[in-house]
Amino acid sequence: MTNPIVASQPQMAQQGIRRLLILSGQADWSRQQAIMLRQHLAGDWLWLSEQPPEGVNSISPTAARTLLGQENLHGVFDATDGLNIEALAIVAGTLRAGSWLLLLVPEWDDWPQRPDKDSLRWSEQPAPIVTANFIRHLQRQFLADPDVVLWQQDRPLILPAVGSRPCWQQPDGSPTAQQQHILQRLMQADSGIWVLTAARGRGKSTLAGMLVTHWQGACWVTGPGKAATQVLNQQAGERARFWAPDALLDYCQRHDVSDIDWLLIDEAAAIPTPLLSALLAYFPRALLTTTVQGYEGTGRGFLLKFCATLGDWHHLTLTDPIRWATDDPLERVMDNAMLFHDELLGNHPLPKRPPVAQIEIPLYEQRDWRDNPELLRRFYGLLSTAHYRTTPLDLRRLMDAPGMHFSAARVADAVIGALWLVDEGGLSEALALDVWAGRRRPRGNLVAQSLAAHSGQWQAPTLLSRRISRVAVTAAWRQQGIARRMIAAEQAHARQQQCDFLSVSFGYTAELAHFWHRCGFRLVRIGSHKEASSGCYTAMALLPLSPAGEALCQAAQQQLKRDWYWLQQWIGIPTPVFLRLPEPPEVTLTDDDWRELAGFAFAFRPLEASLPALQRLLLHTELPLSALRHYLQLRTPQSEIINTLGLIGRKALVALWRQEAAEGMAMIDVDKMIMSAKPSARCSTVRLPGRKNLTICQC
């Protein structure tokens, strides 16, 4: 049985191609066939599995990112219990020409109805779910590809012959014709920003390393992580200094870097755009490389959004693969399965522009992706063009995660707008109170839980809501009100479904806040920490649909207005123009403040959520409360407070903050403190100056 597979490998190596072999059956049978092939074919045989056989070179799929920059001959991916699609894409990208990738799956007909353990990572469900839509999509792609080999248990192996191909010339380390052409342009650059995009395996990082070795002056390198720049550094040797992006910006702000000729930014689309913009200002020349598509997301959104803000930039691209032949069968089937192809990423020719009022806004559910694969390609492709963080994990959510809702803007067959919403809420009051107190954070419910955990609105998770996860409009149709029309359609549908509100979470900018305001949303929260992905503070907004949703929205917005004076001092962004603030700022301690303070002192609410109430508390007590005053009023770094007070780590500092908050409350009104603490208290002992210590316990 194994001889045809073994016999085909020399021809595959000669042609520079790789192929996919699917072993479908009972897990023991599939693994045994893989072991037999491993014994007959020499190679590295990297095995990705949670339960690999003894004696194999194995790694868990969850650790697949450690493989970036490696190359292997042959691999096995065990998907008998669950399919980590990003890990599959990663291992496929590490395989050299001449490799077989063995994919172990359940029995073919049963596979779509089998619960997938990998769904625990992305479905926000407590138990594995059936992912029939995505698995059937995979099966269609596998069966449609003539170079994919499907070997089912109790059925004979039929190995399709490899078509005639020219012999493949393995790269010898010198630049390809495409690389040489681009390298010559870069070597002649006096100044400017160059953006190099390519699919994986095209040699863009190698080209960046070649620039370092050929350039006579100094070049610095940065990227989302040192592992991501491994190929570049291998090519450049010791000539390029690597910096973490935030450390590089800090250095540039304090030192003269005018003697550095080039800044090379590998996988630039994975770095927050505000950080990128700040870095580019310090260097006369910059080369930014990014992947057009892949398991980390698509760089097309990066091109459309970030590069459009640059004054002087030049787009470069590499199309020819280096590590395998053109039209490689494994790359082709992986691209089809994960909708990676460029022509699928929203680049369909658009029909003649009709009046905006004639654009259709249909609503979709997941069964529509199953019944209309082309619609799925166009909808997902548009999301991929607009959002760098759109990954295969999003494709799995979109197709199978519970509680997903979609709408599109369509002109004939073209999808020019896409909107994706997620169900949230419906938690019990007891669980919602635990979320507010910081004791529980169940899966999902991003905005609903955040309003409880950070904005004091404990009831938010008990209401029914839908969160806007993604919204996109193709570039040629923007500024036409299409996004607002899609949101209005979903607003009407959600109201019919008895939802209390729509919500959205976004990286705060004045432009985005204005957009959501025009869509009818009201700003209810701005966080105190910047998002790693956007470099912006997290903002949340609500659009109420019911009296309960209206009451929540008013309470949350009023809380934001009341707290803004203190929050703005912490984050330093301008006040949103539509946030009408009280004058002068509120300093009285209200019942809401007492509840918030009790949640911090006697439960597990984070200091960031309780910061405004704590600031008001400090104005009402003359107690020293040195740990709180140093941090909140004097802005002393936490490490300095820990050293000054002789504490052992941050955990001890947080415990002291909570103790001081309790002491301050007790000094002002001990009875009110006790009443406020009862609903959420953990076991606590409060030192009362001049009185016995007070123990509060709900055990």
Curated annotation (Swiss-Prot):
Its main location: cytoplasm. GO terms for cellular component: cytoplasm. ATP binds at Q179, G201, R202, G203, K204, S205, T206, L207, A208, G209, M210, R323. Acetyl-CoA binds at V471, A472, V473, E511, R518. Keywords: Acyltransferase, ATP-binding, Cytoplasm, Nucleotide-binding, RNA-binding, Transferase, tRNA processing, tRNA-binding. Its EC number is 2.3.1.193. It comes from the Bacteria. Catalyzes the formation of N(4)-acetylcytidine (ac(4)C) at the wobble position of tRNA(Met), by using acetyl-CoA as an acetyl donor and ATP (or GTP). This is tRNA(Met) cytidine acetyltransferase TmcA. It comes from Yersinia pestis (strain D106004).
